[in-house]
A protein has these predicted regions:
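Domain-level recognition of nuclease-like catalytic cores that cleave nucleotide substrates
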Residues: 149-176
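Conserved catalytic cores of phosphodiester-cleaving nucleases, focusing on short active-site segments
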Residues: 64, 93-98, 104-118
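Short, charged, amphipathic alpha-helix that recurs within catalytic cores of restriction-modification
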Residues: 118-149
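Short, flexible/disordered intra-domain loops and linkers
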Residues: 45-49, 84-85, 119-125
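Acidic carboxylate-rich catalytic motifs and surrounding loops in phosphoryl-/glycosyl-chemistry enzymes
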Residues: 76-78, 146-153
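Active-site metal-binding core of divalent-cation-utilizing nuclease and nuclease-like domains
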Residues: 74-104
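Short, surface-exposed basic-aromatic patches at helix termini and helix-loop junctions that form
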Residues: 65-69, 99-101, 134-141, 162-166
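Acidic-basic catalytic patches of nuclease active cores, encompassing PD-(D/E)XK
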Residues: 1-12, 17-80, 139
């Protein structure tokens, strides 16, 4: 599945590049490219959901890289090997290096980007997904934060897990 997720990301990047060059791809062209490159065909109907998530990740990177105290925003990529490793350890979306008190003193944080779309006012993070992200964070000895884009409000929030309410199988956060 990991290779299929990376293939979907590659199609998104190609589609975005074509659009940026004022030569947008048709839906048929996108579907053909997905069919040729994505081995797990069950993921293809979910392309638009992936597309929204990738667009949120791109927006996060562009906005937060403009902050004067941010030194670097490094995408950590969608591809992870061995594929089964995501069951126990998952790499988040970004590592950010920022000034911590002075220009010469820097710190790093790991960011997992989430999109809350439509009229939703809450986001749920499954505990097992948090656990595998947290394990990576602990191994890197860097804090894990969540960059959440609340589309309806047009607002980003940066949250630690402590901002979420713990439920039986998930952590839940509300914009309200």
């Amino acid at each position: 599945m990991s290779n299929s997720i990376q293939a979907i990301r590659n199609v998104y990047d190609i589609e975005k590049g074509a659009r940026d060059n004022e030569s947008p791809m048709s839906d048929e062209e996108i579907v053909k490219l997905l069919e040729r490159t994505v081995s797990d065909k069950s993921l293809i109907p979910n392309y638009h959901r992936f597309e929204k998530g990738y667009a949120a990740e791109d927006l996060f990177m562009r906005i937060f890289s403009l902050l004067p105290w941010v030194k670097t925003v490094v995408p950590l990529g969608q591809e992870q090997f061995p594929e089964k490793s995501k069951e126990e350890l998952q790499v988040p979306d970004y590592e950010i290096t920022f000034e911590a008190g002075s220009e010469s003193n820097t710190s790093c944080v790991l960011i997992e980007v989430k999109l809350v779309d439509g009229d939703k006012q809450t986001h749920e993070l499954q505990k097992y997904k948090y656990d595998v992200l947290k394990k990576y964070s602990c191994q890197k000895n860097e804090p894990l934060l969540f960059g959440i884009f609340w589309r309806k409000q047009g607002v980003w929030t940066i949250n630690s897990i402590e901002s979420f309410a713990e439920k039986s199988s998930a952590y839940k956060i509300s914009y309200e």
